[in-house]
Every structure is written in structure tokens, then in C-alpha cells.
Swiss-Prot record:
Gene designation: dapA
Subunit and interaction comment: Homotetramer; dimer of dimers.
Keyword set, alphabetical order: Amino-acid biosynthesis, Cytoplasm, Diaminopimelate biosynthesis, Lyase, Lysine biosynthesis, Schiff base
Protein name as it appears in the record: 4-hydroxy-tetrahydrodipicolinate synthase
Subcellular location: Cytoplasm
Length: 295
């Protein structure tokens, strides 16, 4: 196993009925993801964790709590990226102080930096932390697409060790994997792209669906890396309907609803996102029961 691992769960953030951070349920969920769903690592305060609506205090509470309670059994990756280099540096320093194992840095959003700006942004942060870094490219959300050349330049920096790639650009993914020759981990940035990314030499996935089908996803990855691509594909086809059903609305609305229904209480999403309707929840649950029948 390399770097952060192969199956990384982008953990949702549990809230109570008042919409506040539910610390006990955060720990409970993290333990389930590691002990029952076979997650090698957890990303905290990412897109799935509703980072835009978490305060800095809530993020640090989450980082420290999960690192203390679960960090002995899984890598804890703190989502510290933002559209401000200064704020990213400040949160990264605090995350390092509480003991996280690595950080995930999304490309700065809204202000649309150039490729040169992106390189300077990430290099500046890498030079001021000892933590290993996963870059996160998700242009549909950020408005900026990190180019192949920028990624390859950044991969030369010692503590930039991985990429979560959610652009769907498989040509870019193939070229980055080929050029870095096994020295840089590339992860599928969404569950639906897991098989093509593995086929190109990718390490694994930063997953949303693994909250409920982590064991299946880990089995797929293990089968593929054991040169049993037929088994991996067959397993993937079984869970594919549930993976696509999670795309019915903006992430993390569907997965939070599914976890509430089939695993444990994690509360509602925070505005400006809103929960699934009863009809949407019923449809999602039917797909889940049908495609993941043993649960």
C-alpha cells in the first residue's frame, strides 16, 4: 500500500438536530468507515464534508477529534484548501499542530488563478508544511482546471505526493501516471470513474459511496491490483446503479440521506443545500436495496 492508501472516504460531517457539529456521531461514523467499510484514510472537511459551511473552529475540532480517536487505524487527511493562500496556510499550520497525517488542497475557487498562479499557490504551501499533500482538481466546482503540465511540475515537489482528479479528463490522468512512473499517486475523484482510472494505473479512489459500500469498493480495487480485472468489473457493475443514484442531486445531499436511512443518524445538510424530498429518498433507497441487496 502506498501513500495514503487505496480506498479513501471523503467523510460527511454529522450534525445534530440544531445543525451543530455532532462530535460523538463524527467519531462513531469515522470508526464505522475504518472498521466496517475498510477505508484506508478519511478526508475531513472536503466537498462531501460540507467545508464551505464549516467554521474554522468546527474544522479544527473535527481534525483533532478524529485524529485522536481514529488516527491510529487510518490516515487522516484534512481539507485545508480555500481561495486564499493566506487562509490555507493558517489552517494547514493548525491542522499540522493537531496531528493530522496529511492535507488535501483544492484548487482556489471563484478567483480563477492562472496555471502559473496555481503552481505558486501550491508550492508556497508545500514549502511551509512538512505534511504530505494531496492536490484536488475539480473544475466543475472551482471554475479552474489544473493542467497536466502544472500537475507534473507540482509532482516534483517532495511532499506533494498525490492527486484527486475529478475533471473526467482521462487523457490527462493517463499522461500524469505515465510521466510520474509510480512516484505519484493518482486517485479517481469520483466513484463512477474508478474503473477507468484503475485501468490507467491509478492508485484508487477518494470515495463518497464508501460510506455504505466500502467493502465492495475495496474488493474491486484489490481484485484489479491482483490482475483480476474481470472480477473487478463484475463487482463494479453490481454497485454501479447505486453509485449513479448518488448523482441525483448535488453531493453530499444524496449520500447524507442514504447514511441517515441505512447506517446512522448524521443530520441534514446545511443551507444553501437542502435534503432530498420524500419521493427522491424513496427512489434512492430502492436502488440501494436492489443493487446492494446483502445490506
Amino acid at each position: 500500500m502506498r501513500g495514503f492508501g487505496e480506498l479513501i472516504t471523503a467523510m460527511i460531517t454529522p450534525f445534530n438536530k440544531q445543525g451543530e457539529l455532532a462530535t460523538e456521531n463524527c467519531v462513531k461514523l469515522a470508526k464505522k468507515l475504518v472498521n466496517e467499510q475498510n477505508s484506508d484514510a478519511l478526508v475531513l472537511s472536503g466537498t462531501t464534508g460540507e467545508s464551505p459551511t464549516l467554521s474554522t473552529e468546527e474544522k479544527l475540532t473535527l481534525f483533532q477529534l478524529i485524529t485522536e480517536k481514529v488516527g491510529g487505524n487510518a490516515n487522516i487527511i484534512a481539507g485545508t484548501g480555500s481561495y486564499s493562500t493566506k487562509e490555507t496556510l493558517e489552517l494547514t499550520k493548525k491542522a499540522e499542530e493537531v496531528g493530522v497525517h496529511g492535507i488535501m488542497l483544492v484548487t482556489p475557487y471563484y478567483n480563477k488563478p492562472t496555471q502559473g498562479d496555481l503552481y505558486k499557490h501550491f508550492k508556497t504551501i508545500a514549502q511551509k508544511t512538512s505534511l504530505p499533500i494531496m492536490l484536488y482538481n475539480v473544475p466543475k466546482r472551482t471554475g479552474v482546471d489544473m493542467s497536466q503540465d502544472t500537475i507534473l511540475k507540482l509532482a516534483e515537489i517532495d511532499n506533494i505526493i498525490a492527486l484527486k482528479e475529478a475533471s473526467g479528463d482521462f487523457n490527462k490522468i493517463a499522461n500524469v501516471i505515465r510521466e510520474t512512473r509510480g512516484e505519484f499517486d493518482v486517485y479517481s475523484g469520483d466513484d463512477i470513474s474508478l474503473m477507468p482510472v484503475l485501468s490507467l494505473g491509478g492508485t484508487g479512489v477518494v470515495s463518497v459511496a464508501s460510506h455504505l459500500i466500502g467493502k465492495e469498493l475495496k474488493e474491486i480495487i484489490d481484485a484489479y491490483h491482483a490482475n483480476n480485472s474481470r472480477k473487478a468489473l463484475e463487482l463494479f457493475q453490481e454497485i454501479y446503479p447505486f453509485i449513479t443514484a448518488l448523482l441525483v442531486k448535488t453531493n453530499p445531499i444524496p449520500i447524507k440521506a442514504a447514511v441517515n436511512t441505512h447506517l446512522m443518524q448524521v443530520g441534514s445538510v446545511r443551507p444553501p443545500l437542502y435534503d432530498l424530498s420524500e419521493k427522491e429518498l424513496e427512489q434512492l433507497s430502492e436502488v440501494y436495496k436492489w443493487s446492494v441487496g446483502k445490506y
